[in-house]
């Protein structure tokens, strides 16, 4: 069988770049395969995707050498229009994908360009939406849809093209666990029905394993460093060495010094249950649990907070909780649970009446949004909704200029924060040249320059690879140690388990859990009620059959925190 995608000793260097972005790349993908191309930010994986779909060389100029064939043809010799018939692409930023004012209009875009007659067009659009179970949303505006629904509509649009290859650029970047699982199942279903070749660009290895991949291609610093089945890749130690995260249960097994004997470490169900339970019980017997924590001063107190949008039922219903100085709290819950509404109420966007929001004991209900912003900062999930300036340095300096800081102070604060957030080398770059993850770090860096008391972060690590995830969260912990408080609105269970001192879970506007993250996320009933996903580590512990899996989770993350000096 001939490969449908073939790279042979391929090199590409962007115009004005000092060196090639991808170097001596060789790999083959065969018809009907499901392949993950993984690497951290800047590794060259997106460049490979652009070579496949024709954005290189037709939108991004540069010099290439070597061989690239898509379905037997060199895409460099055709046109981007011709290439779009072979390779359909779903972008990381769902909002950037939409053109139509309604779902059906957006799905019909390709057909309109092909001058398909109206009757046939309506039929094809209807069939495509039915394939992805979105036919009941055909009249809705894309902006009324959730992230997962937007992703699904984009896929429906691709199905109208009959492209043989479906290319997904970080499809899970902005999705909650339920939507992520839905997207993966949808891709599997499309592959099963139509035998499309699936190529996914991602750094989230664990989530993509649910796709039953045929192989994983790892790229680092522009070079292919490994190609193999998921079993082969996970049995090696290569992922951490190139800044990618292993599944949490594998990290746990290594931390417990588990010997997998015959290298069977994936899938989890293939492990020897007795060996796993033995090493877990042995490890637990050696642990001591430190419950004594230093007394912290209360920063935020929320009492009886309720909120309803006009002509709608309550979105928040009698919410009560406290937040201490230097504390990191994860705010969890399914889409529509009230997480964003709560954040908007804290910063003053939503006006509430019969409640109390106290900062350092002072009721701030009468404060303006601007005054609240001096003590509570909010960072949106989508960085494109926050960035207003043309360059990195202008963006990070913007709020400091509004606060009338001197030029010298602005320069010192801006450069210091850029270095901490690993953005200093890009300080003079135009915003449009940044990746999504870099833009995310920039919005957070901009907030940090003004020294608020509490920062609310909406999906702080979305769009960031594991290297920058670890680096950024280490930085957040250092800030917390100095007394700065954080609330994370997140769907990332690993983030909550590893870095949150506490987890608050919302369901239909009510607080249904408020405890340490290990206790909350080790409680099956809470996970089920809130539509949250079990971590693979918790699945491993349940698989082992030990008597008290919740106890293990507490001990495990307590041990990590003590080791890191938290």
UniProtKB/Swiss-Prot annotation:
Main location: membrane
Organism of provenance: Bacillus cereus (strain ATCC 10987 / NRS 248)
Protein's UniProt name: Putative ABC transporter ATP-binding protein BCE_2668
EC number in record: 7.-.-.-
Membrane topology, from the record: Peripheral membrane protein
GO cellular component: ATP-binding cassette (ABC) transporter complex
Domain of life according to the entry: Bacteria
Domain ABC transporter: 5-246, 300-533
């Amino acid at each position: 069988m001939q490969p449908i995608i073939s790279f042979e000793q391929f090199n590409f260097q962007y115009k004005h770049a000092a060196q090639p972005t991808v170097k001596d790349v060789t790999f083959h993908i065969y018809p009907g395969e499901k392949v993950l191309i993984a690497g951290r930010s800047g590794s060259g994986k997106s460049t490979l995707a652009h070579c496949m779909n024709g954005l290189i060389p037709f939108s991004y100029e540069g010099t290439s050498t070597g061989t690239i064939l898509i379905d037997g043809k060199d895409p460099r010799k055709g046109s981007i229009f011709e290439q779009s018939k072979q390779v359909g692409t779903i972008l990381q930023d769902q909002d950037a994908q939409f053109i139509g004012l309604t779902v059906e209009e957006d799905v019909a875009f390709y057909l309109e360009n092909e001058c398909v007659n109206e009757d046939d067009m309506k039929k094809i659009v209807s069939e495509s939406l039915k394939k992805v179970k979105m036919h009941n949303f055909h009249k809705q505006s894309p902006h009324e849809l959730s992230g997962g629904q937007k992703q699904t509509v984009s896929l429906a649009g691709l199905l109208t093209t009959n492209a043989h290859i479906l290319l997904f650029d970080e499809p899970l970047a902005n999705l909650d666990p339920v939507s992520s699982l839905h997207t993966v199942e949808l891709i599997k279903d499309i592959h099963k029905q139509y035998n499309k070749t699936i190529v996914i660009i991602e750094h989230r290895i664990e989530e993509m394993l649910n796709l039953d991949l045929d192989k994983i291609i790892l790229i680092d610093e522009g070079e292919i460093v490994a190609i193999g089945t998921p079993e082969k890749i996970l049995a090696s130690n290569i992922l951490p060495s190139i800044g990618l995260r292993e599944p949490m249960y594998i990290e746990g097994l290594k931390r417990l010094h588990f010997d997998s004997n015959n290298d069977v470490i994936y899938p989890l169900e293939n492990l020897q249950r007795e060996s796993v339970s033995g090493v877990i019980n042995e490890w637990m017997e050696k642990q001591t649990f430190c419950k004594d924590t230093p007394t912290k001063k209360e920063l935020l107190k929320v009492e009886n907070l309720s909120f309803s949008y006009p002509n709608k039922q309550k979105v928040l219903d009698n919410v009560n909780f406290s937040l201490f100085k230097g504390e990191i709290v994860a705010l969890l819950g399914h889409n529509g649970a009230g997480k964003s509404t709560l954040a908007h109420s804290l910063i003053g966007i939503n006006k509430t009446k019969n409640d109390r929001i106290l900062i350092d004991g002072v009721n701030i209900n009468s404060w303006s949004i601007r005054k609240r912003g001096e003590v509570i900062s909010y960072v949106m999930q989508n960085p494109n909704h926050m960035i207003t300036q043309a360059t990195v340095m202008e963006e990070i300096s913007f709020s400091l200029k509004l606060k009338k800081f001197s030029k010298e102070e602005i320069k010192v604060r801006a450069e210091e924060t850029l270095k901490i957030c690993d953005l200093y080398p890009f300080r003079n770059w135009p915003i449009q040249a940044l990746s999504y993850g870099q833009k995310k770090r920039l919005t957070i860096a901009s907030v940090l320059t003004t020294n608020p008391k509490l920062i609310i972060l909406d999906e702080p690590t979305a769009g960031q690879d594991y290297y920058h995830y670890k680096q950024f969260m280490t930085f957040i912990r250092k800030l917390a140690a100095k007394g700065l408080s954080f609330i994370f609105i997140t769907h990332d269970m690993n983030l909550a388990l590893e870095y949150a001192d506490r987890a608050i879970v919302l369901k239909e506007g009510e607080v249904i859990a408020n405890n340490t993250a290990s206790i909350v996320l080790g409680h099956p009933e809470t996970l089920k009620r809130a539509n949250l996903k079990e971590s693979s580590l918790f699945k491993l512990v349940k698989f082992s059959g030990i008597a008290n899996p919740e106890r293990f989770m507490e001990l495990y993350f307590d041990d990590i925190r003590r080791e890191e000096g938290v």
